Amino acid sequence: MTMSKEAVTFKDVAVVFTEEELGLLDLAQRKLYRDVMLENFRNLLSVGHQPFHRDTFHFLREEKFWMMDIATQREGNSGGKIQPEMKTFPEAGPHEGWSCQQIWEEIASDLTRPQDSTIKSSQFFEQGDAHSQVEEGLSIMHTGQKPSNCGKCKQSFSDMSIFDLPQQIRSAEKSHSCDECGKSFCYISALHIHQRVHLGEKLFKCDVCGKEFSQSLHLQTHQRVHTGEKPFKCEQCGRGFRCRSALTVHCKLHMGEKHYNCEACGRAFIHDFQLQKHQRIHTGEKPFKCEICSVSFRLRSSLNRHCVVHTGKKPNSTGEYGKGFIRRLDLCKHQTIHTGEKPYNCKECGKSFRRSSYLLIHQRVHTGEKPYKCDKCGKSYITKSGLDLHHRAHTGERPYNCDDCGKSFRQASSILNHKRLHCRKKPFKCEDCGKKLVYRSYRKDQQKNHSGENPSKCEDCGKRYKRRLNLDIILSLFLNDT
């Protein structure tokens, strides 16, 4: 039987390190590498593509890591790159000039252990008659004999030691559990890497910003923030992402399916983690706690923003005025003050606003919506700040005090206007007569004097007043007399 030209060998799927690269891996990562290589090796055996399986299998099981022999290097033809010498051997049948001994010697010369610069095929033969085991594996390949059969998938295997692997894959067995959080893993080496999260070990540091990570994969993903690399592209909209998981989450947006429903309010979500975050609103759970002031938050991102308050760092600042902000979003909002940009327009009256939240509040003027209601008197307000200010009328709270005369006020704007009396500041000017005034409302009254307008009318006597306040005073006096 002639071997297929498309036959996959262990070298085709193996991840081979140089000695320098292997030195960058810690013990847990080496074990994980060994486990993955071992599984790839077993999978190849299950389809009968690898004849010299036993010794490679034993060396992987003994955690003796392999790497490409770079002792002999040659100058590459393109770009002058140094490339490791790679030996290839023809895909020939057993009667075309390549014996089992020759194949084994070629493999032994191509792969070497980290502590040896070269390795001889005789070193393999000394360990438990490995050559006879190779010949046994090759003879099985020649004859096609596969004595072990799986009862579930009817797949045949040439080695009983490999027979259990497909069953393990089908059952997705995760026998190694974390004592801290209960998360399970297929490999104990993967568990060891996971446990760094609980131990706080962060062995991998970014050279650009100094941020540390518990896994090298997380560092590689983070470095794309600095390089701008987004290798994972959405086929529908072309949007790029730094990590595959973000692309997977994004693709569900195109599907539009919302399978996760909140039992409390009925709101639907695309992802289960979005539902979990939302449910904290109903349960009041705040699992993320500040270690400095013990304030708790529903989201980790909220905690991260809060922690910057303690450090005093404001990494986002305006180049013109130097004002700093904790979040870049706040910086972008602030910059609209300098640019004068007001991109949000009201369709009813055409008024423009810098922020979408301002537009939403303004639209309540047209709709008449007043969602904030006082529990004591039933009066409603458009904004929450308006309701909070109204509450002070019931409580009598006046938190803003004048340092000059001691007079108290319910709101900050009132004390600012009051202080102009002490400093004799009159920032408002009548456009008709040029008279300077303390308050903006006084300027409006002055303009009414020039125009003769008296908009406030008493319904009982018909008398008109320039200011609504004057009418209210007259009415209160009349009611007291009666």
Curated annotation (Swiss-Prot):
The gene is ZNF223. Residues 8-78 form the KRAB domain. The keyword 4Fe-4S does not apply. SMART domains: KRAB, ZnF_C2H2. It comes from Homo sapiens. InterPro entries: KRAB (IPR001909), KRAB_dom_sf (IPR036051), Znf_C2H2_sf (IPR036236), Znf_C2H2_type (IPR013087). A zinc finger (C2H2-type) spans 176-198, 204-226, 232-254, 260-282, 288-310, 316-338, 344-366, 372-394, 400-422, 428-450. May be involved in transcriptional regulation. It comes from the Eukaryota. Keywords: DNA-binding, Metal-binding, Nucleus, Repeat, Transcription, Transcription regulation, Zinc, Zinc-finger. Belongs to the krueppel C2H2-type zinc-finger protein family. PROSITE patterns: KRAB, ZINC_FINGER_C2H2_1, ZINC_FINGER_C2H2_2. Pfam families: KRAB, zf-C2H2. Its main location: nucleus. This is Zinc finger protein 223.
